[in-house]
Amino acid sequence: MAKLGTMPPQHAAKPVDEHAARLIPEDSVPIQTQKPFTTLSAIGIGYGVTNTAVGIPLILSTAMPMGGSPQVFWGFLAMAAVGLATATTLAELVSAMPHPGGQYIWVNALAPKRYRRGLSYTTAMISWVAAVATGSSGNLSVPLNAFSIVTLLQPDFVYRRWMGFAAFQAINVVTCFGACFEHALPKLSKAFLLFNVVSVGVIIVALFAMADARTSAKDFFTTVNTSGWPDGVAFIIGLNGANWCFSCLDVATHLAEEIPSPGTNIPKALLWTIFIASTSGLLVVLAVLVNLGPVDVSDYSGIGIFYRITGSKAAAIGLWIPVLILVLASVWSIQTWQSRLAWTISRESGFPLHRHFSKIFPAPFYTPIWSLVGSAVGTALFGCLYLASELAFNSLIATGILLQYISYSIPTVLVLWQGRRNFRHGQFWYPRLGLVANFIMLAWTVVAFVFYCFPANAQVRPSQMNYVSGVLVVIATFIAALWILYARKNYRVMEI
């Protein structure tokens, strides 16, 4: 039976019984004393969310109409560079200040005293909403891509929104339960990492082995833009898909209390995640584009492309099922991500019901169960929006990646504002390369913030409109209202 106890904030860094999970009352910091993660399992859960190689077939339907093969190839390389810059930026910050709160803790440490609480809370809520929006996207992606198998076998099948909604909510419940057991998380993350690598290898070999023809050099490098936007604008808008393949990089930073030596192990996990993502993702990009043949805009769904290349429905389905399993696994990883954010924010009294959300449950869980449930409820509510309006739901989940970049940018700007030379850095620190990485990430944040608010087609109909900018205003209003009505009086960062 695990021991229960308290730990005052000023003593939170002292060695503790590694087998004890502590439930902490008011005026103390609830800490996670279980440290089952290693660098490898942190890579597994981080890459499990990023899911780069598996994500390539999923984003082709949105990327190919914006520029064809060059859009996918050069766009992937561009986003790999942005991903490396983002991972480097986060690695420097977590090396200096390892903490499961991540971005909002860094902001609290770096911001001027006058603005510290407000900026820290804003960053915290942006991070959490980004995680819930991303999880909602994954919850819907699984059933939509599962029903694509039905469509391949039965072309007259008519998808109904309630089908996706029911599957969305079922997946939300199952993955929430699967994230409840602390000591199972690293084992599952390593297992899924291995399954991911093997599946990607099988997909690459199968596409090359079963393709009847190869794409000509002319087709490979010919831009095919059917969006109505100028080629340059279409290219940037089309980067959204590849950008998702290098998103959610802060996941590993929120494991700081669940891994030994987080100041060194988490930066390693971040950079290894980018290396694995870039290598495996590029191989899948080449496997698809080299074997796709002449550009045909009729069907760029992932399973449709697998069928087109292999010429076999059975082979296409056989390759598609591992993709679905890995997308489902990414939703499980996201449940861990968003719950850890809710838990740490609750430790600072950032949520109503924070006394419940901040608790670490004893054996056999050792996890913040109420934070898991609360975050899953938030995801479920987002799913209800899908049932009401698919357009509103799509605009909401599209904000996920922008909110991530905003949460990364706030502490980065504060580091630059006070001067990198004055920053008390950790072991992972590159004075010049780190500065370049900071500017690349910030520059891309600005570009993405502008162009990701554009609709995919220049000749847009109301049913295709992009309401991301409006959703961002709603989210900002929600955070401001929560601050004024609750957090201004209750929120306090106790760790720093």
Swiss-Prot record:
Pfam families: AA_permease_2
GO cellular component: membrane
Membrane topology: Multi-pass membrane protein
Coiled coil segments of this chain: none
Highest taxon listed in the record's lineage: Eukaryota
Gene3D superfamilies referenced in this protein's UniProt entry, alphabetically: Amino acid/polyamine transporter I (1.20.1740.10)
InterPro entries in the record: AA/rel_permease1
Subcellular location: Membrane
Major location category of this protein: membrane
Disruption phenotype: Leads to lower intracellular accumulation of SW and higher extracellular yield of SW.
Record-stated family: Belongs to the amino acid-polyamine-organocation (APC) superfamily. Amino acid/choline transporter (ACT) (TC 2.A.3.4) family.
Taxonomic source organism: Metarhizium robertsii (strain ARSEF 23 / ATCC MYA-3075)
Keyword Mitochondrion: no
Spans through the membrane: 40-60, 72-92, 124-144, 162-182, 191-211, 270-290, 314-334, 368-388, 396-416, 434-454, 467-487
GO molecular function: transmembrane transporter activity
Residues carrying a glycan: 225
Record protein name field: Transmembrane transporter swnT
Gene: swnT
Keyword annotations of the record: Glycoprotein, Membrane, Transmembrane, Transmembrane helix, Transport
The keyword tRNA-binding belongs to this UniProt entry's keyword annotation: no
The protein's role, per its UniProt record: Transmembrane transporter; part of the gene cluster that mediates the biosynthesis of swainsonine, a cytotoxic fungal alkaloid and a potential cancer therapy drug. Does not mediate the secretion of SW and the exact role of swnT in SW biosynthesis remains to be determined.
